[in-house]
Each structure stands twice: as C-alpha cells, then as structure tokens.
Amino acid sequence: MAADLNTLKQDLTRRMDGALETLRREFAGLRAGRASPALLEPVRVDAYGSEVPLTQVGNIGVPESRMLTVQVWDRSLVSAVEKAIRDCGLGLNPQTEGQLIRVPLPMLTEERRNELAKAAGRYAESTRVAIRAVRRDGMDQIKGHEKKSEIGEDEAKTWSDEVQKLTDHYIKRVDDALVEKEKDIRQV
C-alpha cells in the first residue's frame, strides 16, 4: 500500500505543479516596471492567413530596462506586428525603424499598479482554489480506498496528513509568488 501513497502523492504533486505553472504564466503577462520578453509572448499576429504567436515571426529583445524590441524576420509583416502590439491591450505604443520595432514601456501610474496587484491577487486565489480541488480529489480517493477496506483507518489518517502537508506546501508557494509579484509591481 505504501506504493499507492507514493503514486497518489506523485499524481497530486504533478497536478499542483501544473496549477503553479499556470500562475507563473499569468504573472508573466502582468507588466511590472521592468521590461520582460514574456510581456509580448501572448501577442498574436495576423500572418500568412492565420494568427500566429509573435515569437514565430520575430525575436523579442530587452535592450534596456524600460524598452522591448522586436526584430521582425519578414519585412512584409512589420506593420501587422506593430498593429498586434498596439492592439494587445497593454497600452503599448510601438515605434518602427525598418524591421526593428521598439516598444517603450511607459511608467505605471499608482492606479494601474493597484489594478495589477489586484489582478495578481485574483490569479493567486484561483490557483489556491485549483490546489484545494486537487487536495479534495486526493482526500476522496483516500476515503474510497478506506471504504473498500484497501487501507485501514490509521493508514487513511496518515495519507490524509501527507496530502494536507503537500497542499500546505503548495499554498505557501502560491503566497510567496504573490508577495514577490506584488513587490515587483509596486517597485517604482
């Protein structure tokens, strides 16, 4: 039965890791004070008759802390890339120089920082909910094993404690990531 506990923990760990990875991707899209290529990664460009990720039509660079650049590989796509960046909803104003697009990042207002911090909090809370759902599923599996008399009451308690420790660990990681992101957002 010990192997079953390990299998259960591995499954729950994999699923909780997935929730944490989703949070990291969502946080990467929240623009803080510094430039990061992750800011433009979700941008999709109308190219070759379909929408493709920006990373498939050019290189994203960070020449300085408040500037991103996009080196577009195909000259015919420069205006489409510029339009996609302008329309992505991040309030960016790209400037084109040949096949290089410069994207200066404006200073964040206090109001915008508060909005970003609230969004980060919402992302963190939805991740906590996802982790708790994984925990609930694990607890249900343990109860199922106990009902089928596959494990005893003491073993079920031990397993439940292990699942709770795992859940607490991941919730703490979410909280730590949120504190770090809020600090990043509020940094002037």
Curated annotation (Swiss-Prot):
It is found in: Cytoplasm. GO terms for cellular component: cytosol. The keyword Cytoplasm applies. The keyword Membrane does not apply. Belongs to the RRF family. NCBIfam families: frr. This is Ribosome-recycling factor. It comes from Granulibacter bethesdensis (strain ATCC BAA-1260 / CGDNIH1). The gene is frr.
